[in-house]
């Protein structure tokens, strides 16, 4: 099966993409652009010559190739991003019939499909936060923003968490009430948000169009009257679809964030749970989300459409920031009023930073594993590890599940603090002989990071996130070059072990 990557790779040449094939199946490639093709392409734009049989046949052949390429490309997008993302890419990206599928169009259609599918590596995770927004196009179409906290990690579905924060006015706003503080209401789910973001007139036309097409399909086109034929032309746009209750709604732009702590891919339950070091604090977000809802019930909080703190976008951002978004990207408030577009841009920036750090963390893990290929390094590191015997995993698992007693938790924290000191001393011992001309900038940066980023039981989530990001990025740069000696490889393994201690303290911090 042809995938999206094949189209992206073929489009890099700048030529239009075509789909050919043989008995083995379809093949994507860049169209040949020789002297003949260049000549016919030129003649197809000359008024006196474009109607010649040879030129017309060439132009029709190109149009057919472009249509076939587009059909296969949309199918590939559907396989990767789902039918909704592929439909959006077709609606917004393939505007002219028979237009060439070139690098710009491939890039735009992939971008549109990704947008409707959702952005972020956390989408398949069991513990995630979803920031949703509908585009703001002025006061008449203000859009919306909401946030959902999901936790489906427990095998018992009754213990799953679904907390949705969606801030709305409790009454329909008039044209002069944009600055008024009025009573708020909160909606309980994304499905209700979707229904609220489609106008009654649009919903009516969608129903009429669907009914007309069904009638024409059943009775035949020739029996349809003019009104039915007209209604049948009104198709749903990208994002407009029926839910399982047969209600029309408009899908949002989605940005996915991982929750800090143990997590797993819902698509592959056989894989062991892995610790996510960089993410948002689920417990803190749940507390703030419930505070917001209580404030709506008590009347302490109000809704004001043009506001930095009391509209839908500002409330969604409030809960996002409560989870530690500013540990990754500083937040800058809007000058006059928050809006879904500004909120979406900030959410994207936070998601990109979190995903980049987690990818860097995984890359560091893989590279440090390869350091064990050296027998001497493996033996030396085993000797050091066995001398300590402490492990971060039991603490992290127990802290994350809330099963460890306070006494046991403190004992484990003390054990990890001793291990931090031992790793630091081992790193200093390995570095003792390297000074002056034998110590390069990378060594100095790593030594400084190890000194500044040693975790402790006093660190909160913000401090641990800051230390982890500095150490991961510094070690990642250090690993770009192969270690010149065994001591250099062991220093890198010591730094990697320190990241493991940060994970252990992080697990305790989010469980506190």
Curated annotation (Swiss-Prot):
Q: Name one Pfam family in it.
A: SicP-binding
Keyword match Coiled coil: yes
The transmembrane residues are none
Q: What are the GO cellular component annotations? A: extracellular space
Keywords of this protein's UniProt record, alphabetized? Coiled coil, Secreted, Virulence
Q: Which domain of life is it from?
A: Bacteria
Chief location of this protein? secreted
Locate the coiled-coil region(s) and give their ranges.
347-376
S-S bonds: none
Localization, per the record, is:
Secreted
Family, similarity comment: Belongs to the BopA/IcsB family.
Q: State what this protein does.
A: Plays a role in mediating bacterial evasion from the host autophagic pathway.
Name under which the protein is recorded: Effector protein BopA
Per the UniProt record, the source organism is Burkholderia pseudomallei (strain 668)
The organism's lineage is: Bacteria, Pseudomonadati, Pseudomonadota, Betaproteobacteria, Burkholderiales
State the encoding gene: bopA
